[in-house]
Amino acid sequence: MDSKGSAQKGSRLLLLLVVSNLLLCQGVVSTPVCPNGPGNCQVSLRDLFDRAVMVSHYIHNLSSEMFNEFDKRYAQGKGFITMALNSCHTSSLPTPEDKEQAQQTHHEVLMSLILGLLRSWNDPLYHLVTEVRGMKGVPDAILSRAIEIEEENKRLLEGMEMIFGQVIPGAKETEPYPVWSGLPSLQTKDEDARHSAFYNLLHCLRRDSSKIDTYLKLLNCRIIYNNNC
């Protein structure tokens, strides 16, 4: 591994260690968050938000690194970006386009959108890990990040479900979420088409993880700090 790769890996490990230490200091275990189930959770709303914000930021960092690594390794000169625009499986969700729009959106709507985005990524992340494992010569930097993102997405979803339950007690979160149907594209024998499908999926993951991170930080500021942040 070159010195640049070692430095990047060291930075990620340091970030993960810092996040883990912060969570332990706050008395928040990573898994399970509530040993007796969400209904018996004693973790404060502030701690749940702190944990969720850190995890979502970490996921977005990993997503950006994985996309950049894939772009450098497989997409140079292929023109994949033009095919990736507006082709995400989550495009049907009416998400705010920028921070200003998100600030005008009710907190219940933002939380439902975050839950919808997280749930819509469970299936593609599982298959992303499976298919990347089968790729010949795939860099460890891509596979390790894919595995981590899948695990952290589940943790973040668990945390957001508990936040939703505390902020809106008794509410039923039953909004449908987009279903991903891109597995055949990840398994095609046409190498360029397969790489294009991976590129598109990673592009969408980076985009959606950025949205989740932005919405969560806004919710944290609005609900926990009464917009004084």
UniProtKB/Swiss-Prot annotation:
* Keyword Signal listed: yes
The species this protein was found in: Ovis aries (Sheep)
Please list the GO biological process terms of this entry: biosynthetic process; blastocyst formation; cell surface receptor signaling pathway; female pregnancy; lactation; negative regulation of apoptotic process; negative regulation of luteinizing hormone secretion; negative regulation of peptide hormone secretion
| Record's protein name | Prolactin
Superkingdom of source = Eukaryota
Function of this protein? Prolactin acts primarily on the mammary gland by promoting lactation, mammogenesis, mitogenesis and osmoregulation.
Q: Name one GO molecular function term.
A: prolactin receptor binding
Task: Cite the source lineage.
Answer: Eukaryota, Metazoa, Chordata, Craniata, Vertebrata
Q: By its UniProt entry, which PANTHER family does this protein fall under?
A: PROLACTIN (PTHR11417:SF5), SOMATOTROPIN,PROLACTIN (PTHR11417)
Which Gene Ontology CC terms are recorded? extracellular space
Alphabetic keyword roster? Disulfide bond, Glycoprotein, Hormone, Lactation, Phosphoprotein, Secreted, Signal
